[in-house]
């Protein structure tokens, strides 16, 4: 089991989604200091709500396309580890809203990478991507 006794600071984008919610729960239970940045949960009820993830992490509701809001949350968190899960993953939606999908999946990733580039605290970055880029 992952042991984060040193209270590693972790920043997760997409923390209100299915995978992000489970990851938050796992990392918080392992002792990490988790900050999540994401849109509101995509469904209701959602795993995020049912598992009461908000009680385990600092939850920031925001859009990764909004660099200034993302940067503010990122700077406040001062993470050592960044896990980027935020994406628009629905194929049908990508056909209906190609610009939104591009802005979220490509430019949102550019925004989080820019936050990492400008920071002095990040030691590790993981990009979990989708084939909808």
Predicted features by range, described:
Residues 1-133:
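N-terminal Rossmann-like NAD(P)+-binding domain of SDR-like oxidoreductases, especially those catalyzing
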């Amino acid at each position: 089991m992952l042991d984060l006794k040193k209270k590693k600071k972790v920043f997760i984008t997409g923390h209100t989604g299915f995978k992000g919610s489970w990851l938050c729960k796992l990392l918080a239970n392992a002792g990490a200091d988790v900050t999540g940045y994401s849109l509101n949960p995509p469904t209701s009820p959602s795993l995020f709500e049912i598992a009461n993830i908000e009680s385990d992490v600092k939850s920031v509701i925001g859009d990764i396309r909004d660099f200034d809001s993302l940067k503010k949350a990122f700077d406040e968190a001062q993470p050592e580890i960044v896990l980027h899960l935020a994406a628009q993953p629905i194929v049908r939606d990508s056909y209906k809203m190609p610009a939104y999908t591009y802005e979220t999946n490509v430019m949102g990733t550019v925004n989080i990478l820019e936050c990492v580039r400008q920071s002095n605290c990040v030691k590790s970055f993981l990009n979990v991507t989708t084939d909808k880029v």
